Amino acid sequence: MQRRCLSEAKKKYLAKMTEMDPEGKEIRSIKIAKELDVTRPSVHAMLTRLSDDGLLVKEHYGIVYLTPEGLATGKKIIASYNHNS
């Protein structure tokens, strides 16, 4: 798949979601909002963008999960954050 440049906001969401669920199972959007201390509408908008990028799948009732590409990208972001600290 084509390599894309991710905004810092997208990186923050992917890293947090990967930390919350390193297995790539399911995460509730309300939990993401609480973890990042942002509003639910903000989470919804970002999850839509990440879904459009093919990095996660949105299901009913606020359930999302990272695609294999999303999970791999999240792990790379976390590794780069750890390397830079």
Tell where the protein language model's regions lie, with residue ranges.
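Short acidic, hydrophobic short linear motifs in intrinsically disordered regions
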Residues: 23-33
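Short, hydrophobic-biased segments on the C-terminal half of alpha helices
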Residues: 47-48
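Basic, amphipathic "hinge/linker" alpha-helix immediately C-terminal to the N-terminal HTH DNA-binding motif
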Residues: 62-78
